[in-house]
Amino acid sequence: MSHFSIAGMQLSLPCGDNLTTIGEEITKTKKRFPWVDMIVLSELLTYGPEKKYAEKLPSKAEIFYCELAKKLDIWLIPGSDYEIDGDDIFNTTSVINNQGVVIQRYRKIYPFCPYETGVSCGQDFVVFDVPQGRIGVAICYDLWFPEVARSLVCLGAEVLIYPTLTGTIDRNVELSIAEATAAMNQCYVIAVNGLGDYGNGKSIIVAPDGSVIHQAGINKEIFPVEIDFALVRRNRERGLHGLGQPLKSFRDNSISFAFATKNNRKSSELSKLGELKIPKS
């Protein structure tokens, strides 16, 4: 079988310890949709976007989610939490399998600078396997950087999952980016946003052809969907409607993208943009 079911949970929760409420919501979702294989939460849902809740891993929250995943026999991507590692704080998501084991941890590569201050950049891309195929994970603002998605896809990702927390007026731009990311990489894109003081919802699931499977509104919503990994492979092998095969073209082209190296990113042209800081009036 090539099908794998994923439910996104778009919730409104305050800053503070939300573990009990989240556990109840996950349990209710699994009871209502027993066929769901994985549940995905929004970014920083457990405690909210305050770094005073940062913990070393494995944390109380991560252990809680592991026990819940094992109890319910379900995969979990429980949004993200701030992680302390030495002198650094990372925005980190855990990937927990249905035996309750953390199989991967991903640190957000692109914190939302200059607003998400005091958060270090992750350095590693993360993909993981479920029985039906391979999934890549990134977080929120990572979506704005096509290099992240393409790197995950080159590692074999067929589904890209983005726990997200944004309440800004550019949400509709992000939805367009999600659609384009799915089409350009011939994969599913799932971006689960939060609600309340920091999130404006509009979570989205996009098919490998760039079409929107579901877009949530601005209220609490649980949205399960069945992913078909065979559809991803067919689109990549044959092209959408037998047309473009961009991943094969990317693979076979001889060009090297010099701009992607660290030195070239600091070119004179990009340096003209000035310092990365919050604009003044």
Model-derived regions, located:
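Residue-level recognition of beta-strand->loop/alpha-helix junctions
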Residues: Q10-S12, R107, N193
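CN hydrolase (nitrilase-like) catalytic-core segments centered on the catalytic cysteine
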Residues: L57-L76, W144-F223
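C-terminal beta-strand edge segments of enzyme domains
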Residues: V127-D129, G194-S281
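Cys-nucleophile CN-hydrolase/nitrilase-fold catalytic domain and related Cys-dependent amidase chemistry
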Residues: L13-Q99, R105, G167-A183, C187
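Short loop/turn motifs at secondary-structure junctions
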Residues: S5, P34-W35, R134, G156
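Active-site catalytic loop in hydrolytic enzyme cores
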Residues: I63, I84-E158, T168-S176, A180, ...
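Eukaryotic scaffold repeat domains enriched in small/polar residues
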Residues: N18-T20, T29, K71, C121-G122, ...
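Extreme N-terminal starter segment of soluble prokaryotic enzymes
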Residues: M1-G8
